[in-house]
Each structure stands twice: as structure tokens, then as C-alpha cells.
């Protein structure tokens, strides 16, 4: 046999070659096994179902000879295949020739039957040997005996297959001496990153591949790269991690030079090769490096070095390196990756809220979740950090061990940047290395965060900042992102931009942007602004009063952007404005003027708006904007919504590029000026609820108009000529539709009150209409059958038509997915006009039953029958709706029958397991319904909300508090489940509805006081009613390996504390009691779709992810046991 040294020095292409009979294991054991190998970054040979023949395929032979370990899966039909047996011969040959390691697995097979070729396995083997030579049979027998004598894995001796697979994978790692470092195992979310990177790295490929890791500063790119480097290094002949430290150390003797220098480049290559070959003195010359590493399989990580010269010097060409090499480039600059033809890019995204909270808790508390009394504070701090991992870790470490009072005092200060965070983020800004890009960054941080990209480009069009190129550079460097045409900058980067501006001068009026309330108030009140100020942004919700000096803007004649705004237009907060009558100046260079709740009747008389691009003055006191005609060629958007005193619109004849005009709720406006006929680019006109508007100039045909809203214009006497190509029209509560209306391209139409939905109207509508809303018309009694001509109609809303009795029959609107007939109080028959409806609202109708035919609505997700006072029964066929997520029968005061089960066995087949967690039923104020029977008869997972003041006796454990203790209970299964009930009291609420979350957490305790906590089980509910509510829901806590480790071995967890809590900070809600019924007491629980034998949470994948935790906990238990024995 070859020595281990020769074996280990061999350059293997694969770590593992699996030999198996596909008939037995390909789609079962093998698929799980290969998935676990991939997860652990173990490279396996995959045959991709090579067509089998009698002789061994050359590709397979190459795979065997170039694999470090052969895993032979003996199964029932393994010996039936000459192919498998020939594979085995080659494996034994490699084992003898160069020390290939072999691991046998006996899958539902007695090892002795393989070893001796007896039993069913022996019979199958003898059948295969027919017509074979004696020599061939002998060699097969010897190979079977040889491999079967090796200590391997017998599946019968394992409790579950998942555990065995994980053990085999760890065994392989151990045999290869590539056990991964534990340095990164506790990092939250790191396994997800490694799994995603694994697919990009494609380690089983022999190509030399370059992969990029891209994302903003502080998001964890380097951490991911180091975790990968730690885990993968031992699988390569050489590995080098190149970062700023490596470069600076390598270049110490060349301080002051740069990499363009020839000698510098050689010196850097020499340092690189010294790492590759682990030698100090290496002599090189031009072109030597690529020749020296050409046959070396190397792992190279270049971290956060956006220096083209570094990449050119060390990894300019992939062909420099040996087969299977991987080069990982970590950067904030996506352009840098594209410029170097790196197409495989992993974008590192911000963690979810749950992961962010866990990251913070690891840093602050050294555990995954906060103590109960720190829950809200921890969530607030995580929010302040904007989910940025760097911020979460820094803030967590700063607050670790500090009392709650200090946390509360510190919260206001967390708005600023911590020194370490600021320093890290500042590197990203300095890396722009371009004054124009830096200026755009500051503009976005101080003025434009959250604005539309198209608006920003227009507002900066004359700035000489090369906006298109600059925005692309900022996106590439992860300093901003673009979503749905909106520009977003992370809160910490935004704070960095503001901090950079603050350092421009100790005098706020000398800075380019004013962003802090105190500074703005000081500058405006004391008239200290200068020509250096380009923009001001002020949220008026932050102050109760504002003093503005009469000449405050005269010194700021370069001011381009003025944003005095509120995010809470729906709240009538009073702000005391101190604006003198002599205030008569705004800078004429203004391009953006947003001044919500502007307190004066008119803009300053000396204001010249010629440069305006966007004018937004919602809920102002304006009666008019200005007098006369101004050149407004740059104006694109005018928004005066809610300016109830506005009596006139200025002459807009020179606003030829205006695209959006929003005047809704300008209730004093009587007419539009005739100059709107010149607005040839206007595409959105909103005049809704201008309830004094009487006339629109005749003869106006706005050819570009796409959206028109005249809803609530109840005095409108004349219509403008509506363009035929308009796609969205709302003429609710207006005059009758013109008889000559032809809307060829209309997509959405909203009508109400006096308009009649008659056949003549239907002929005016385009068959392409997708949404039709018709409401508040008491004279409307029937829907014309011609509605079937709207063959693309998706949403039909006929609301509050109290004399509507029926809908047409015999039609099927195939495209209809949403139907709303709410408050049609005379409607008695259940609608039957489409079988594809997913959302059906029949609330406050006169319908008396949910019929058997409800099962035809197979796609129904939401059913609302709230307030159907005539409803008597709900057909059990509703239980067959496998997509149903929510049904509301609240205030159905006559409802007496609501059987939800049908045949539980049938529903188990019909309904998917993962559907039940979302099915919610509301039976509040259904006083004639036997609610106890409804609860008791539920044999599958539901969430119910009912009327009640106390937990029913059906629940065997009850309390008036929020927790229940079960002192003597055996926890020995792979799950813990029960039916829970809480009493929620709703005192009052001002909104239409109130939503709340109930979380359930279990603590499992043993007789020594050891314990572990489950993950929280969340539930989300909505109610519109006051009083006491019973909320009933089933809770499942599947135990992955992380938890089952606690349940086996020496300790018995026989005590469970169950905690219910409202997670909403809402004083109107109170949790006044709770109860549980253990799963063994719930009828037919074992037959539920969510029962443990098919519960998604109890699966092999989740078990496989917990191996390191399981080993660590076993060691902890052993240490604890030793202590107990030594007492």
C-alpha cells in the first residue's frame, strides 16, 4: 500500500467519489448525502446519470482515480450491476496503489451478507455472475469482502438518517485533515452566506474561477471572506489572504512609492510567492510569477483593495494559476469587478430584522435574544443601527453590561455615528476619489434620500456634477441603491454625509447644507446664512415654532433646494410660525421648493420662479402663488394638495414641460385657467375633492394625459375632452359621463353616485379594462349581463349599492380575481360569476348562507362576510378551499352553524402542511354559534378569534396571568405542541382596526435547573371590535438538533414554563388570561397535516446544520456530569 505521505501529497481533483446503485438510493439517501457534502464545501464527483454499460466509463474511471476518498453505498441492488462491481474493483485498486481511503455504508443491508455474499444480496450477486468468467467472479468477491471488512456505517444502528449523514461528512473532513475552524461558527447568518457563495465558487469545477463579494462598508464582506478562507484553505495546495495589512507589510521598504513602479510590483509579487510556497527567499523576474504558480491549486482572497495595480500584479490572468484555483475579490465597487470581467458576484444584503436583532444580542448579551425587560430597547437600538452588522456589533459591545437606565439615556445619542463606525464608513466616501461623486453623495445624504431618481437628475441637471455617471458610481460602490425608481441611502451612510457637511465650518451658515433643527432655526432667525448654503431640509414635526427673519434668505442667494416638510400630513399638528409681513424674498435660483403648511397667502412678491423644477406646498395657507406670467420651462411637478384657501392657479402657458399637476382638496378653487391647454406634456392631473370647481375650459384636449382624477368634484358642470388613450379615470361623485365618451385604452375606471352602469356605458368602455369600481348609488338594482364583454376584468367593486338584489347568472369572468360587493344590503344570493376569485368581500349583505358551491372557488384566499346579519349557516365545503388564508364572520349575529371540518382525513389530503399557519377565522359577536364546540371540533391547525372574557374550561391549564407552568411533564419527542388560548381586552382605538402580535415562548427545565428556551412562536391578529376577545391557536415547537441534544443523554427535561406576550406597544390592549390544552388531548391531532411526522421544521436539512452545536452541548453535559459526580 502506498504511504500516507504519498497519498496526501497527491493533487486530488475531488474529495469524494460515491459508488452506488441509483435504483436504490439516488433520489433518497444519496441526494441528501451529496447536499450535505456541498454544504460543507466537500467536492464530490457527480456522474450526472452517465449512461451505464458493461465496461467502466473513462470519465468514471478518472473520477475514481482522482478522488481522495471513495464512499461505497452498499444497497440491495448494488450487486445486480456489473457497472457497480467494476467501480468497486477500480476503488480497491486505487486503495492499494496510492492509499485512497474507502468508507463503506450499508444501506438497509446486513454487512455480513456483503462480506460473505449471502442472503438476498448473495442471490442477486450470483445472478449477476452468470455468463461471467470465473476470474471476474473471484475478483468481484474479493473486492466485496475487502471493502465490507472496513469499518463503516450501518444505517440500522442509527436513530435517523440525517444524523448518520452528518457524521459521515464530519468523518470525511477528519480523514482529510480539513476540519473547519471554529472561529466563525457562532457568527449569526454566516452559514447562509457560505452556502450561497458555495454555488458561485463551484468548487467541483476544474476551471480557474474569479468570484466577487460586493456590498457597502460595514455589512460583513470581510467577515464572510475570512470565514470562507478559514474553511477552504486546507482544500488547496496554497492559500493567501491579501488585505491592506499584507500590502503595507510587503511594501515597508518602499514607503512613499506606488505600485506603478516596476520594482514595487516585483517586490509585491515576491511577498505573494513567499506566502504561496511558504519560503522566505524567492528570486523572481519579469514574467516569472505566472510560470511559478501555473501548476499550483491556490485560494487567493483580495480584500477591499480597489487597486487595479494590485490585481494586475497578483492575479491579472486566471491562466496564471493551476486547475481548480479560486480568486475571491472583496470590494464595495461593483464597477471594479465588471472591469476585471468578474461575472460571478455575491451581493451581500442587509440582514433581516430578526437576524439583526440576534446579531445585536450576541454582541450585547452574548446570547441570541435579549432579556425580557430589554426586548423593546434592543429592537430600538437595532433599528437605529439600520441593521448594518458593523453598527450592531459596535453598539452591542458599547452597551454590554450597562444597566437599563443608561440604555434609555443613551438612545438619543445613538442617532450619531460611533467613532469606529464613522471611521469605517468614511473609507468608502474617501474611496470615491472624485469631487463630483463626493458632492452627489452629500446632496443625497442631506437633501435627496428617498426621492425619485428621475427627479434627482432633473434637480441636478445644471450642476455640472455629471449626475448619471456619479449615481452609477455610487450604486456600484454600494453607497446608495435604487429601488423602483427611488434612491435610498442607508441611515448610517446618510449620517456620515451629514457629519461631513458639519465639519465644513463651525458656523452653520457657512456650510453647503443645513440639516439640523438647531442650526436651521439659528440661521433663519438671526439671518446668518451665506452664499455657501445650497440646501436646507427641515422636518417641521420636530419643532413647535419657527422664527424666520424678514431677510433670512437674502444672504443665501445660491440656495437651490428648500425642503420644509412634514411626513404626517394626516395629523393636524400646530406650528407657530413667526413670519414677518415684510418677508419678501426667496432666492431666484431655487430649483426645489417644498414648503408644507406654508403660512402666508402668497409667495414673496420678489420671488422669480423661473428656475423651479419641483414646487410642492401641501396644506398651505396660499390663496394664490404669484401674479403675472413667468417663464416656467423647467417646472415638471406642481403639488398644492390640501391648500383649501387656494382660489386661483397662475397662468401656466409657459410651463410647457409640466408633467404632474396635483390640486386635490383645493376646495376654494372654482376654475382652471385656460392656459392648461398649453400643457402638452401633462400626464397626471388630480383635481379630486375640489368641491367648488365648476368649470374646466372647453376645447382642451391634453393629448399626453394618462391619469385623470375628478372624484368628488360635485359642482363640476362641464367636462374637458378626455383623451381616448387615457388609462386611469376616477369620476366618482361627479356629473354624468359625457355621451360621446370613448375610452379605447382605459385600464381602470372609478364611478359612483349619479352615474348609471347601463349597457350604453358598457359599450363606451374598452374591453381591456382591468378594474371597475362603482359605488354609493342607491338607484342601481342590477348589473347588466354585457359586463361579460369585459373579458380582461380582474377587479370588480360594486359597493354600497343598497338596492342591488342579484348579479347576472350564466356568465364566467375568467380573469376576475377580486370581487367586492360590500354594503349591498339587499343582495341575497351568493355570487356566481367567476370561479377564479381569490378575494371576495360580501360584508354587510343580506346573504343567508355560504352554499355548497363555495368549493368551486378553489383559489379563494380571503372571504369577508363581516356584518351579514341574515347569515344562518356556513357550508362545511368551505373546508375544501386549500388556499384559504382568512375568513371573517364577525357580527353575523344569526349564525348558528359553521362546521369547518368535514372529513378530517379528506382535508389532510387536500390541504398542504404549510398552509395552516396562515388560516385565520373571525367569529367575534356570533352569539348564537356554539363557540366551545367550534374550538373542540377543530382537528387541524387554525387561528380563531372569538368573543369572550375568560378562557373556556376546555383548556385544561388556565390562568389569569400571562404564563403557565407545567412542573411534571415528559418532553421526549421531537416536538412540543399544544393548543393555546389568550384573553385579549381591547379598551378603545381610534383607527378602523387594531392589529396585534402574540408571541409564545417555552422554557424547558431539568431537575438540576439547567434550561433552554425555544424560539418564539409568532401569531398576528387583527380586530375591529372592542371588548374581550378569545384568541385560539395551535403552537408547534419542532426540535432541531440544537434542541434534541438537550433531550437525550443524562438529563430529563420534565418542567416547561410557557410565556404568552403581546409584542405591540399599545396601551389599548391588555392580555388578561391564557390557557393551553396539550396536543395529546386534542382530537385527532396525530392526523393533522402539521403533525410531527411530516412537520417541515423537523427535517434532515435543519438537523444537519446543528452538528457543531450538538457536539459542544454534549461536551458541556459531560463536564456538568463530572462535577455532579465529584460532589
From Swiss-Prot:
GO molecular function, one term: ADP binding
Catalytic residues identified in the record: 87
Residue stretches of each LRR repeat: 197-221, 540-563, 587-609, 610-632, 633-656, 658-679, 680-704, 766-790, 791-813, 814-834, 835-857
Tissue: Ubiquitous.
Pfam families with a match to the protein in the record: LRR_3, NB-ARC, TIR, WHD_ROQ1
GO terms for biological process, alphabetical: defense response to bacterium; signal transduction
PTM sites of type N-acetylmethionine: 1
EC number(s) reported in the record: 3.2.2.6
Residue span(s) of domain NB-ARC: 191-452
All copies of domain TIR, residue ranges: 12-176
Domain comment quoted from the record: The TIR domain mediates NAD(+) hydrolase (NADase) activity. Self-association of TIR domains is required for NADase activity.
Binding partners and assembly: Interacts with EDS1.
Task performed by this protein: Disease resistance (R) protein that specifically recognizes the hopA1 type III effector avirulence protein from Pseudomonas syringae. Resistance proteins guard the plant against pathogens that contain an appropriate avirulence protein via an indirect interaction with this avirulence protein. That triggers a defense system including the hypersensitive response, which restricts the pathogen growth.
Note: Ecotype cv. Columbia does not respond with a hypersensitive response to hopA1.
Name of the molecule in the record: Disease resistance protein RPS6
Protein source organism: Arabidopsis thaliana
